[in-house]
A protein has these predicted regions:
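Active-site glycine/GP-rich loop and adjacent strand/helix microenvironment
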Residues: 1-258
Length: 258
């Protein structure tokens, strides 16, 4: 088994193709994936995960973790969310008023690390917007499970009356095989509202492709952001700054109140 960022698995697949390496003989049975979501909110594989499994017959497992919590929410073999370890941390899903959200609602994951050593935290706000699942899992465990991260609280975008998180845009862009790579830039316009500019790289640039992508955005999210075509090297330089352990997919240039 590998522990990897999903987008790096795609790079491994690309490398194998370029060097005539048969992945069937690799001996890899699966990957425990970190840093990027694998699933939609209904736990089906998202487009990124489908791209991996369609080219490499391995099983993918999601995990959610952070340095601060000193533990992880890992998927079991049923792959229906990451299991909570109540003996290690107390997990709460809170609204903007620090109150527990109703069942089946999204809120900010807040943790208290009473069961781990070295770094105790009381009601630490992770900044990640998630939904809890409390029904019994098919594996037999009864612990709460975390669904896929909806987005970062600070990356919430109010765009033309619609609330968006970058992962929703990731899923749409990953639907297009023509898009080699991309980066999402968020900024403020001259009246102080949010603007989105998505920079993509493609080997087949055309107005028709841009129109298809925009139509897909309107169908899925009811809005269509600005989309620009750039050289692949320009986008990759933005995606992989020096010392970064995983690709940067969002650049948030919005001004924040001090």
């Amino acid at each position: 088994y590998l522990i990897a960022v999903p987008s790096f698995l795609l790079k491994l697949i690309e490398y194998a193709k370029q060097h005539d390496i048969d992945l069937k003989t690799s001996g890899v049975k699966g990957a425990i994936c970190i840093g990027e979501p694998l699933r939609n909110q209904d736990f089906s594989l998202n487009t990124l995960a489908e791209k991996i499994t369609s080219q490499w017959n391995i099983k993918l497992f999601s995990t959610y973790a952070s340095t601060e919590m000193n533990t992880a929410f890992n998927e079991c073999e049923k792959q229906q969310g990451g299991h909570h370890h109540p003996e290690l941390i107390i997990a709460e899903i809170l609204d903007e008023n620090d109150q527990a959200v109703p069942a089946n609602h999204v809120g900010e994951l807040t943790i208290t690390t009473l069961g781990v050593e070295g770094m105790p935290l009381l009601r630490f706000k992770t900044g990640d917007m998630v939904q809890a699942h409390t029904e019994a899992c098919g594996c037999g465990r009864n612990t709460m499970r975390l669904g896929p991260v909806v987005g970062r609280k600070k990356q919430m975008i109010k765009y033309k009356g619609t609330t968006l998180y970058p992962p929703a845009m990731d899923n749409i862009l990953n639907d297009f095989s023509e898009v080699e790579c991309y980066i999402i830039e968020i900024s403020n316009n001259n009246i102080g509202t949010d603007e989105i500019c998505i920079k993509i790289a493609t080997k087949t640039p055309s107005d028709k492709l841009l129109s298809r992508i925009k139509d897909h955005f309107r169908a899925k999210l009811r809005v269509s952001p600005k989309i620009e075509i750039h050289d692949k090297k320009v986008i990759q330089k933005l995606q992989f700054p020096i010392m970064s352990r995983k690709p940067v997919m969002v650049i948030d240039n919005r001004k924040t109140d001090s």
